[in-house]
Amino acid sequence: MIVAVSPQLDLAVSAFFFRDNRFYLGDWGFFPFLRRGLPEIFIGIAAAFGLIWGWGLLRRRWLWGINTKVMLLTTGSMLLGPILIVNGIFKTFWGRARPYQIIEFGGNKNFTSPMVISNQCDWDCSFMSGHTAVIFWSLALALLLPHRYRKWGISAVIILGIATGIARIAQGSHFVS
C-alpha cells in the first residue's frame, strides 16, 4: 500500500542492490538457485502430492487427508492464482518493465508506478513475481501436512517466500511492490 502511494520507494529499494552498473547480488549465494531451480522443485512437490492422491484413489485409502476434494482445491488454486492471475494476466498484460530494464538502472525502458498499466514490457514483465506466487501458493500444501509437521511446513514456506521476494528484488527482476 505504501508503495502505491509512493512509487519512488520502488526505485530506492532497487537502488540499494544496484552498484557499479549492475545488480551486484544477482549471482550471489543461493539467489541463482531461487531463480532457476526453485520453481521446478515446487512443481515436483506438487507432483508428489498428486501421486499421493493417485495412490489414495487406487487404494481407496487417503493419506494425510489428500482426497479428490483437496486435490481439486489445491490444483484449482494453483491454476487460478500463480498460473492464470499472476503469470497469465499481470505478467502478460500489465506491461511494467523489470528494474534492470529501466533507464535508472542502465536499461532503456521507463519506470512506471505499480498501479499503472504500461507499455514498457511486452512479455514476462515485472509485476508480479511468479516465483514468489508459486511459493506462497504452496502454503496450501503445507496445510495438508500431518499436524506435527504443519507448523514447520508453514514457517518454511513463509521464510522461503520472503527470501525469494528479496532475492528477486536483489537480482533486479522485481520491484518491492
Stretches found by the model and what they are:
Residues M1-G50, G88-P99, I103-N110:
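N-terminal transmembrane-helix/juxtamembrane module of multi-pass inner/ER membrane proteins
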Residues T112-S177:
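Membrane-embedded catalytic cores of phosphoryl/pyrophosphoryl-handling enzymes
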Residues A12, G37-G44, V70-L73, K151-I159:
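Alpha-helical transmembrane segments of integral membrane proteins
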Residues I2-A4, L79-I85, I159-I169:
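Aromatic-anchored segments of alpha-helical transmembrane domains
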Residues W55-F93, I154-A156:
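Interfacial segments of alpha-helical transmembrane regions
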Residues V5-S6, L51-L63, A142-Y149:
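Structural signal for the C-terminal ends of transmembrane alpha-helices
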Residues L38-W53, H131-L145:
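Hydrophobic alpha-helical transmembrane segments
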Residues G26-G37, W62-I66, D122, L145-W152:
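Juxtamembrane loop-transmembrane helix junctions in multi-pass integral membrane proteins
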